[in-house]
């Protein structure tokens, strides 16, 4: 019956995991292990988890690491940064999944079909400029695909009833110091870093990883 078929499909998926849109692991990923563990745990108990925080705080990197460490059979990562406000979000996500929208059919049906297999995780990265259409799409997907889990990243929450918000804070002083030294020494091995100057610089950078790496 359908239940037996679904169980069989789940076993097959576990043996042949699907991974799309994942980036190589970052060379220097410091001070975020607790966040990774908390987000993975949240995804096991909530169907929608949104990573929020200011630009450059590391939401995309954290989402990529969480996606890579997920044990669910199908994980799709879709970056929305280049999608213009007003664009068709359904078609944009379909394209990112490698499943072009049908010429005459319903693109949403194609998308929900692609995401309906048991144990699927969809990561929607950089949602802040598309909050309304993305929230609308997520609401539909959570209804249509009962086993789908969604991880979104956005500078602000999506304000959906199912949403669990994980706010990503700037790095603590020790992690910021380690990140700067690791990146600086990778760029110029052997250079001497003045501790006092570094402390002053890091205080101005407010623990924002993107600023530290630049």
Predicted regions and their residues:
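A conserved switch/coupling segment of P-loop NTPase cores
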Residues: 67-73, 109-175, 181-182
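Helix-loop-helix "sensor" segment of P-loop NTPases
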Residues: 97-107, 147, 156-206, 211-212
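N-terminal pre-P-loop "Q-motif" helix
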Residues: 25-39
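Conserved strand-to-helix beginnings and helix N-cap segments that scaffold or border functional pockets
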Residues: 1, 87-90, 134-135
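Post-nucleotide-binding-loop coupling segment downstream of the phosphate-binding loop, primarily
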Residues: 37-42, 47-57, 61-118
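Short, conserved phosphate/pyrophosphate- and ester-handling motifs at nucleotide-, phospho-/glycolipid
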Residues: 32, 59-60, 205-208
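Intrinsically disordered, charged and Pro/Gly-enriched terminal/linker segments
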Residues: 1-24
């Amino acid at each position: 019956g359908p239940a037996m078929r679904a169980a069989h499909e789940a076993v097959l998926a576990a043996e042949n995991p699907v991974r799309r849109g994942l980036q190589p692991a970052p060379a220097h990923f410091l001070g975020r292990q607790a966040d990774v563990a908390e987000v993975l745990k949240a995804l096991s108990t909530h169907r929608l988890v949104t990573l929020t925080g200011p630009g450059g705080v590391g939401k995309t990197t954290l989402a990529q690491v969480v996606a890579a460490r997920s044990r669910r059979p199908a994980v799709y990562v879709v970056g929305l940064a280049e999608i213009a406000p007003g664009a068709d979000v359904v078609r944009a996500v379909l394209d990112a999944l490698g499943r072009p929208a049908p010429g005459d059919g319903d693109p949403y049906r194609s998308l929900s079909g692609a995401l309906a297999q048991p144990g699927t995780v969809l990561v929607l990265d950089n949602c802040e400029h598309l909050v309304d259409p993305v929230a609308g799409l997520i609401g539909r997907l959570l209804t249509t695909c009962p086993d789908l889990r969604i991880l979104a990243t956005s500078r602000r929450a999506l304000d959906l009833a199912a949403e669990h918000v994980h706010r990503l804070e700037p790095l603590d002083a020790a992690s910021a110091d380690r990140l700067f030294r690791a990146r600086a020494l990778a760029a110029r091995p052997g250079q001497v870093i003045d501790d006092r100057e570094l402390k002053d610089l890091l205080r101005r950078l407010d623990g924002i990883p993107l600023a530290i790496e630049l």
